[in-house]
């Protein structure tokens, strides 16, 4: 089964007429984790990313090829504490193939289904990684 991709939308800001020379870009996604080995294993398998261990107790996950807006790198750093409460920010993933088959694969890797008040008509599935960080698998990539 093909790995999932991280969804990101890239817009031509200049075309909006609001170009800002001081605008920033997302460089990477950073996740504070309690169990570094567990989370590196889960996210590298989920995304199909390569692992680079740091000397400081962290790990960098690199996408095949170069990081991009649709495939950013991930930095996992040990926090020593468990996650508390609902995420204020989460990842939306899109499968290269059948989204429900991808959900089953992710659950097999250690993800679990999460109820955040869905109505049942959503076009996504809410999951949590082994430490409880919520993320979604979209039925299809977002369009503008």
Model-based region annotation:
Residues 45-51, 69, 82-85, 99-119, ...:
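Charge-dense, helix-prone N-terminal extensions
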Residues 23, 30-73, 108, 121:
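Core segments of cupin and vicinal oxygen chelate
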Residues 35-36, 91-131:
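Vicinal oxygen chelate
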Residues 61-63, 67-69, 74-86, 93-97, ...:
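Domain-length accessory/inserted modules outside core catalytic folds
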Residues 11-40, 89, 141-144:
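N-terminal beta-strand motif that seeds the catalytic metal site of vicinal oxygen chelate
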Residues 62-67, 127-130, 140:
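Active-site beta-strand termini and strand-to-loop segments that position acidic
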